[in-house]
Amino acid sequence: MSDYTNVSWDNVTYYGGNGVALDELELKVSWHNRPASSWSVRRIGALQHKIEQYTFKIYHVNRYGKHSLSQVIPTHVLIQFANEAFGYNGWSSAVEEVLITDVKQRERVRDGAAIELYTVTAEARVKLTLQDGTNTEATGLSKITLPSKGDAYGKAKKEASADALKRCLLSFEGIVIEHEQKVASNYYTDGEFGSRKAGDKRDR
């Protein structure tokens, strides 16, 4: 069991159909799009605080207008915030898939000479995992126009992956909000985030 996870399944009863031997089954818990421990809830809160401080300055001076967060926060800034919130070894990301979805070629005349330009559209899917098992996935997009087809391919893939990573980090806010709503409504019945009503009874 992870040092950051305190989940118990001792009171859960499992049933199997004909021909199913329960002792041969291995219980696997999915922490996709939900916190695996109170550690991740706290750390995601710290990340969100940094994001809100950063965006407040941008929106306050109205330099960019009300664009989406993924447009106004550079990737390197979000990575820095993630390192500060989770620790350098507290999170990791992996590019699950990168696809080139469209390629267009056209000519532009400049100073009397025709220049070929390639517009490449790419899509990437990235998975981000915290050290306690909490994980999420997001899809990023990019469109790059360059005179070199190879350079356009490479940059489009890179920027699509960066966009997906940003969306992963920004999606944590919604994950925690949904989690807190479930805790408040006693959605969880066991483990660290079990029913608050049950917890209140135990504390009496």
Swiss-Prot record:
Alphabetized InterPro entries for the sequence: Rad52_fam (IPR041247), Rad52_Rad59_Rad22 (IPR007232), Rad52_Rad59_Rad22_sf (IPR042525), Rad59 (IPR016810)
Any GO CC annotation of this UniProt entry: nucleus
Keywords for the protein's UniProt record, in alphabetical order: DNA damage, DNA recombination, DNA repair, Nucleus
Biological process terms in GO annotation: DNA amplification; double-strand break repair via homologous recombination; double-strand break repair via single-strand annealing; mitochondrial DNA repair; mitotic recombination; regulation of DNA biosynthetic process; telomere maintenance via recombination
Primary localization: nucleus
Xref: Pfam families: Rad52_Rad22
Subcellular location: Nucleus
The protein's assembly and partners: Interacts with RAD51 and RAD52.
Function: Involved in the repair of double-strand breaks in DNA during vegetative growth via recombination and single-strand annealing. Anneals complementary single-stranded DNA.
Family listed: Belongs to the RAD52 family.
Name of the protein in its database record: DNA repair protein RAD59
Organism: Eremothecium gossypii (strain ATCC 10895 / CBS 109.51 / FGSC 9923 / NRRL Y-1056)
